[in-house]
């Protein structure tokens, strides 16, 4: 984010355990590549996604460390907060940035959530092994990220 271009930016950085994210993005990337090729190696895709996401998260942490003056304009939110109580999470975000939440807005959020229940479109399961990934490698690669943002490890389930 270029704060010089967007001086009034308010950032919500969401966090989820990479052991749940990496197989998902590897599956998405694998599927996208299949559109243009019949020769896609899922294990290669898995290694690439692990490398890309480790690099991106490390760069993000380095940027935040280098610019502590920006921290007041960044709110960290866990995926667990979002899923467990979406309305409270949105209210937390708005309160952090001193934005109003009207009763109508709150009501519309509840209406939307009632009309679109969790897992409305099914549940996706991804395998680390299908992408040549091992739980220990992910735990090692993302240890610093988990510690910095207090990301609770989610047990891997195939």
Regions found by a protein language model. Give the residues of each.
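C-terminal, active-site-flanking charged/polar segments
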Residues: 11, 17, 97-101
